[in-house]
From Swiss-Prot:
Function: Nucleotidase that shows phosphatase activity on nucleoside 5'-monophosphates.
Bound cofactor: record note: Binds 1 divalent metal cation per subunit.
Chemical reaction(s) catalysed: a ribonucleoside 5'-phosphate + H2O = a ribonucleoside + phosphate
Locations listed in the record: Cytoplasm
Origin superkingdom: Bacteria
EC number(s) per entry: 3.1.3.5
Protein name: 5'-nucleotidase SurE
Binding residues annotated for a divalent metal cation, in chain numbering: D8, D9, S39, N95
Length: 250
């Protein structure tokens, strides 16, 4: 089993290190992650400048390779030129903070998994629901459990899976739930500040609260103490509007 690891918090992030340690006994692990934090980068590719790859020489990250680009850059480079042997699985994370509902459209963590899936590799994104890295050891155990299940019972086709893990001690996690994406309210307003030169700076506001956290959603499962596993697809076609659009065009 050859697993490619990536993330969006950067190669120095604790979530990547513990994920690497948890999965190392399962096979060959290749780490290619961003040099810097790229949270919220979504599926962006770097097209206006060349990219470079470096290797960490010390610490728990020794042997990790990192790219001066985005999470999608990392997986794209790995699968389209850097790795002679394609991995069997792409794993992204563990992210600091949830990726539920519409978060998946913005998340660099999910985007790294999406790139693996687009290039024909089964892919999984792991996120902790709350920030702060509390109970990261439990999240790593959950990630290993999921990957072991994938190895033991591989799906028939490439898949894209989004996993959100409650920040709880492992023994307090109630189990696993197959879920759909919930929905959020619109993001909160931008935050404005005036710098010493009198210019107005803008900070993107916090994500909106959940507005659909009903039973069966990722929000509901995580809030109840369960690990949420959501299968994702990339076809954004609104099929229910095709006939109406066709009539509108006539």
């Amino acid at each position: 089993m050859h697993i490619l690891l990536a993330n969006d918090d950067g190669y120095l992030a604790p979530g990547l290190a513990v994920l690497h340690a948890a999965l190392a006994p399962l096979g060959r692990i290749t780490v290619i992650a961003p040099e810097q934090n790229h949270s919220g980068a979504s599926n962006s590719l770097t097209l206006q400048r060349p990219l470079s790859i470096y290797e960490a020489r010390e610490g728990v990250q020794k042997g990790f390779r990192f790219v001066n680009g985005t999470p999608t850059d990392c997986v794209h480079i790995a699968l389209t030129g850097l790795l002679e042997e394609k991995p069997d699985l792409v794993v992204s994370g563990i992210n600091q903070g949830q990726n539920m509902g519409e978060d998946v459209l913005y998340s660099g963590t999910v985007a790294a998994a999406i790139e693996g899936y687009l290039l024909g590799i089964p892919s999984v994104a792991f996120s902790q629901v709350d920030k702060g890295w509390e109970h990261l050891d439990a999240a790593a155990r959950v990630a290993r459990t999921v990957v072991e299940r994938i190895i033991g019972t591989p799906p028939a086709e490439p898949f894209l899976l989004n996993v959100n893990i409650p920040n709880l001690p492992f023994e307090h996690i109630k189990g696993y739930r197959a879920t759909r994406l919930g929905k959020r309210h619109p993001s909160q307003p931008v935050i404005t500040q005036v710098n010493p030169r009198g210019d107005t700076n803008y900070w993107i506001g916090p994500a909106g609260d959940a507005r659909d956290a009903s039973e069966g959603t990722d929000f509901h499962a995580a809030a109840a103490g369960y690990v949420s596993l959501t299968p994702l697809q990339l076809d954004l076609t609104h099929r229910g509007q095709l006939d109406a659009l066709d009539q509108w065009l006539k």
